[in-house]
Each structure stands twice: as C-alpha cells, then as structure tokens.
C-alpha cells in the first residue's frame, strides 16, 4: 500500500512538473513554430452539436485565442434529439461567450438534413458543400474539427471529418486554408488526465494545446452553461476528461 501511495504521489508530482514546463513552453511558441496561421488569421471550429465546443474543443478555442486568432464556430445541428433544440442553441451561445466568441461569430445550422441522431448518416456531399460555403463566407484560414473516430465515435462527428477530408483531398478548399483534426484516444487516456499528459507530450502530434489552471476553470464554466446536458456522468467527464484540458491535433 505504501508503494502504491508513493507511486501515485510521484505521478502527481511529475505531471505537475510537466504542466509547469508546458505552460511556459506553450506561451513562448509562436503560431508559425506550431505550423499554424499567424496572428489575425481566421479559424473556424466545426462541431456537430451544442456542447461539443466545451466538451472537446475548449483547449483549441482558448489556445487559438491566446495566439490572437479570430475564432468562429459552426454547429451543424441544434442538438434536438430530445426536443431541446431551442434551449440548447441558447446554451451554446452562452458557452461560446465564456470562451470569448461573440454571437456574431457563432453559426448554427438547424436543418432536417442534419438531425442530432447517432443512427442517421449525414450526406457527405451536402455537409461538404454547406461547410465550404461557410469557409468562403468567413475568409477562413484554418478549419478545426473531429478526426476519423470522432472522439466519442458519434456518427455525426465522423460525418464532419468525412466532409472536410473530401474537401481537402478534392482540392476544393481555398488556397492557404489548413485543416486540423482533433485526435481521438482510447478510453483509459481519455479519462485519466494526469496519466495521459506525459504520454501526450511524448506522442506525435502537429499541434498541442494544454490549458492553464485559469483556462481550465474557464472551460468548466463554459460546460456549465449546458445545464440541460449536465447529467451525473457529465460532472465526472468535466473532472477527469483530457479534452477539458488537452487537445492534440493533426493536420490533414
């Protein structure tokens, strides 16, 4: 038992050290060094449902803002699976405000073509054409969305990846527009933040955002705006999930 206790303390101390070192390193890195567009560039975070921005992308959104990029958000549904669409749209706007994104830069697509339903496969071409319209309208330099596994495996998340991959591979994106996808990890890493951080720092990724303690509090506050979704297991998610603190991303 003493050995187990010692190992737990050692892991906690090492993780704290990693956090301090990474916080310093992250603040010294320029967008160019990270392979990102420079300050003043326009980033578009593309999500499927209200609360995706807080549950999965808060580190990216706050990290890009830290790098002085103008962040906008495009949500492909109102999250109306339980007939709460109007409530969830308001919650999304509140959450984005906490994350520093004004209502003028939040776009919610509420169409029958894109229902909040894991059993429905969104049409890739329709998602891609809709996304491309918003990319052009916003003068987007960087698109950020889910990877092929969708973090949680939700079919709506994966549909966004398929659409942006189709645009990228088909050469349809505007010149100079880059795409970042949020890396999915296994369940152990997903819910063991303290153990995951050293692993993440040693793993390959193109861009890594780690939140400071102040920014973590900001991300939690954003998540708390989604009151209709705060079931008991979501509180555990907020406490333990890496995605409330860490985003590792890869370029397409």
Swiss-Prot record:
Compartments, as annotated in UniProt: Endoplasmic reticulum membrane
UniProt keywords, alphabetically: Endoplasmic reticulum, GPI-anchor biosynthesis, Hydrolase, Lipid metabolism, Membrane, Transmembrane, Transmembrane helix
Gene Ontology terms describing biological process: GPI anchor biosynthetic process
Signal sequence extent: none
Residue ranges crossing the lipid bilayer per the database entry: 2-22
PANTHER family: N-ACETYLGLUCOSAMINYL-PHOSPHATIDYLINOSITOL DE-N-ACETYLASE, N-ACETYLGLUCOSAMINYL-PHOSPHATIDYLINOSITOL DE-N-ACETYLASE-RELATED
Lineage, opening ranks: Eukaryota, Metazoa, Chordata, Craniata, Vertebrata
Catalyzed reactions per annotation: a 6-(N-acetyl-alpha-D-glucosaminyl)-1-(1,2-diacyl-sn-glycero-3-phospho)-1D-myo-inositol + H2O = a 6-(alpha-D-glucosaminyl)-1-(1,2-diacyl-sn-glycero-3-phospho)-1D-myo-inositol + acetate
Pathway annotation: Glycolipid biosynthesis; glycosylphosphatidylinositol-anchor biosynthesis
Gene source species: Mus musculus
Gene3D superfamilies registered for this protein in UniProt: LmbE-like
Family the entry assigns: Belongs to the PIGL family.
Database matches in SUPFAM superfamilies: LmbE-like
Function (record text): Catalyzes the second step of glycosylphosphatidylinositol (GPI) biosynthesis, which is the de-N-acetylation of N-acetylglucosaminyl-phosphatidylinositol.
Result of knocking out the encoding gene: Deficient mice exhibit early lethality (9.5-10.5 dpc) and is associated with severe placental malformations.
Record-given protein name: N-acetylglucosaminyl-phosphatidylinositol de-N-acetylase
One Gene Ontology CC term in the entry: endoplasmic reticulum membrane
GO molecular function: N-acetylglucosaminylphosphatidylinositol deacetylase activity
Domain notes: Retained in the ER by two retention signals, one located in cytoplasmic domain, and a second signal in transmembrane domain that is functional in the presence of membrane proximal residues of the cytoplasmic tail.
Stretches of the chain found on the membrane's Cytoplasmic side: 23-252
EC number: 3.5.1.89
Membrane topology: Single-pass type I membrane protein
């Amino acid at each position: 038992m003493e050995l187990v206790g010692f190992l737990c303390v050692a892991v906690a101390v090492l993780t704290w050290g990693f956090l301090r070192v990474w916080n310093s390193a992250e603040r010294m890195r320029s967008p160019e060094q990270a392979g990102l567009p420079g300050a003043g560039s326009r980033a578009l975070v593309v999500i499927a449902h209200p609360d995706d921005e807080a549950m999965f992308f808060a580190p990216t959104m706050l990290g890009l803002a830290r790098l002085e990029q103008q962040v906008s958000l495009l949500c492909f549904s109102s999250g109306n699976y339980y007939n709460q669409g109007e409530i969830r749209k308001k919650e999304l706007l509140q959450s984005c405000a906490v994350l520093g994104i004004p209502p003028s830069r939040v776009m919610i697509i509420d169409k029958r073509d894109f229902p909040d339903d894991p059993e429905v496969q969104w049409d890739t071409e329709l998602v891609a054409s809709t996304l491309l319209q918003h990319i052009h309208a916003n003068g987007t330099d960087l698109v950020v969305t889910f990877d092929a596994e969708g973090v949680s495996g939700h079919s709506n998340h994966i549909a966004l990846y398929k659409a942006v991959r189709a645009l990228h591979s088909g050469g349809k994106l505007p010149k100079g527009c880059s795409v970042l996808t949020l890396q999915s990890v296994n369940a152990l890493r997903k819910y063991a933040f303290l153990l995951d951080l050293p692993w993440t720092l040693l793993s390959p990724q193109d861009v890594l955002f780690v939140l400071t303690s102040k920014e973590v509090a900001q991300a939690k506050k954003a998540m708390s705006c989604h009151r209709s979704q705060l079931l008991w297991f979501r509180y555990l998610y907020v406490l333990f999930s890496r995605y409330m603190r860490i985003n590792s991303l890869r370029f397409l």
